């Protein structure tokens, strides 16, 4: 297992700034926005400390942007490089590897499954490339995997600390990519109803879980209240219901 883990790291860090040998458009926008935030406190469109730094024809998720800001201030000492820009993707990919293997080990006790999962996560081209490109969407996969592992640990152990950590993790997932605004709430509603039905969670714990997720994701919620309703919460919730209704009907 150690050899597989070493190979996984090597495939993600070897010549990181040269392979791929192109600067992807979103990477360029992300790195320049982060650099501007470090030095001027604005994105490149002069928005002061934005929740969403503006990129070409839209915004970029805050988690990757502000992780990169932190790295530029610390490791980069104010300077930006392609290697530094891609470092959060590498760290997320390695964490995904560890989380995925741990999740499989919690479900299957046969070591062959653990090795198979490790090989798949280490050598699958998609997982390799997701760790070598600075795309904000790639962080959602890692955050979701961590959240699911913590949810699984709670179901298996019924320990409150795992439920709290799971709620925090799902809340942070909302900062990773815009698609999570639809997927995470629908998933959490369905899985909570299922756990209530199967007595895996009590109603007070379910309420606590929902509160933790909402508190952690409060900036995201406030942003969308402002964007979709001009500050009117009633209009926001009605518009959100209408947006989610087709997805719920399909489920």
What spans do the regions from the language model cover?
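Extracytosolic helix-loop segments that constitute the early lumenal/periplasmic catalytic or substrate-binding loops
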Residues: 13-16, 28-58, 63-66, 70-74
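Transmembrane-lumen/periplasm boundary regions of multi-pass, lipid-linked membrane glycan transferases
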Residues: 30-40, 172-175, 181-251
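Short helix- or helix-capping micro-motifs
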Residues: 8-11, 117-122, 170, 174
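Transmembrane-helix motifs of polytopic, lipid-linked glycan transferases
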Residues: 83-109, 146, 150
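Membrane-interface transmembrane helices that cradle and orient dolichyl/undecaprenyl
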Residues: 105-111, 145-163, 173, 198
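Transmembrane-helix signature of polytopic, membrane-embedded enzymes
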Residues: 4, 100-123
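Short acidic/glycine- and proline-prone juxtamembrane loop motifs at membrane-interface regions
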Residues: 85, 89, 126-137, 179
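Start-transfer (signal-anchor) and selected internal transmembrane alpha helices
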Residues: 1-14, 95, 105, 115, ...
